[in-house]
Amino acid sequence: MIQQALLSVSDKTGIVDFARALHGAGVKLLSTGGTAKLLAESGLPVTEVADYTGFPEMLDGRVKTLHPKVHGGILARRDLPEHMAALSQHGIPTIDLLVVNLYPFQQTVAKDECTLADAIENIDIGGPTMLRSAAKNHRDVTVIVDPADYATVLAEMQANGNTVGYDTNFMLAKKVFAHTAQYDGAITNYLTSLGQDKSHSTRSQYPQTLNLAFEQVQEMRYGENPHQSAAFYRDLKAVDGALANYAQLQGKELSYNNIADADAAWECVKSFDPAKGAACVIIKHANPCGVAIGGTAQEAYEKAFKTDSTSAFGGIIAFNVPLDEAAAQVVAKQFVEVLIAPSFSAGARTVFAAKQNVRLLEIPLGKGVNAYDFKRVGGGLLVQSPDAKNVQSAELRVVTKRHPTPKEMDDLLFAWRVAKFVKSNAIVFCGGGMTLGVGAGQMSRVDSARIASIKAQNAGLMLSGSAVASDAFFPFRDGLDVVVDAGASCVIQPGGSVRDDEVIAAADERNVAMIFTGTRHFRH
């Protein structure tokens, strides 16, 4: 039974109402510093920990709760007579409920003006110590680190005579250890990112020790293949608009491959500004098999589908605008695994209600960019900044005698945007705001060029006057010759080959406009 609670919080959201409810249930309140002041000002009877222990706060508040009367009351096992006898001998009451959250270390070090001294002063000592003590003794002590759990604990207390059950205490204890692990990980990340001069301004993006925190979203029936086990975890620092923030509106449980392909689709479609029109991306095996823009979601989908209707079967489809009923009726004619949009109209929901196997994912658009991209290798982890660079007009360099027309320039920029999301080696034919042929993942760039032109031919799409994007430079003129032979009139590529002059001369020879971006977009 909860008879005495200690409350000491940095995040004071809801703490007064929670404390008032505890007081109403007959629970004695202990507190520290600012929390005690707030509770007292709110008319609640509260005992300062310094008065409770008979030992004042000292060292500018560094020592407040590190006292046997606090930790003894938390750690004593109620089922061990010798523990309870020790408490009685020393006049220590039990503390049955602990509510603590920690100094805002991560928020502090995120500030540009933060100094090492600021960071050090925001390393909480007493808070984690109490939390770990209470979580260790969770059979007897209820511990709360998250204000979102106040209502759960109060409801259980009210239903069970001020008692919280073991299952709830165990759940809360797990949250505590996860929280303190993340807290210590953030401290380690920060301290090991500092340079020799310990200056905040010279912090490395890549600390010597990297601690990451993820929480499980689901265990899966299997992984990439049926003989592999799998689970999906969400980054605790997932940015706005990240796939991991999806809300599934209907459909079967997402598979490992569904999530991998959905991420590719969502990242690609997010690169198109919805203010400039609707965009649709169709993904198969992590590669775009159709991308298009249009005046409406329906138009964008119909154009994207034309690129490769065969590969689109059973694909993942993403939109950068809300999906309305008109678009839904057209998409519903196709077998689709996952459909993603910022929102779905009531009419669209009704259309897909008859197709309950289709997974609908709603993800609000966001401009956040993940801090890191990861790739696991044997015994290690490759870490890099995300490929978030968008080429600016000032960076574009026309290297041929002929300049692209305004229409060609629009097609080139569209093709370049798509090529970034195609597995290397990538060649993409585009025209009229849609992909016409995609060559992906070949060991030879010239083979990717051939495949892209063949795919367009198979789809009955004309490549005459089309634009081509290559994710990396053409090492020889042969790749350029293949795309021009297929009908391309203009090309966009990074440049940077030792044979750039040869490729430029070939473009001039064939009256093709070519642009260098100076940026490569390898994708593996």
From Swiss-Prot:
Pfam families: AICARFT_IMPCHas (PF01808), MGS (PF02142). One of its GO terms (cellular component) is cytosol. Pathway: Purine metabolism; IMP biosynthesis via de novo pathway; 5-formamido-1-(5-phospho-D-ribosyl)imidazole-4-carboxamide from 5-amino-1-(5-phospho-D-ribosyl)imidazole-4-carboxamide (10-formyl THF route): step 1/1; Purine metabolism; IMP biosynthesis via de novo pathway; IMP from 5-formamido-1-(5-phospho-D-ribosyl)imidazole-4-carboxamide: step 1/1. Its EC number is 2.1.2.3, 3.5.4.10. SMART domains: AICARFT_IMPCHas, MGS. Keywords: Hydrolase, Multifunctional enzyme, Purine biosynthesis, Transferase. This is Bifunctional purine biosynthesis protein PurH. It comes from Ralstonia nicotianae (strain ATCC BAA-1114 / GMI1000). The lineage of its organism: Bacteria, Pseudomonadati, Pseudomonadota, Betaproteobacteria, Burkholderiales.
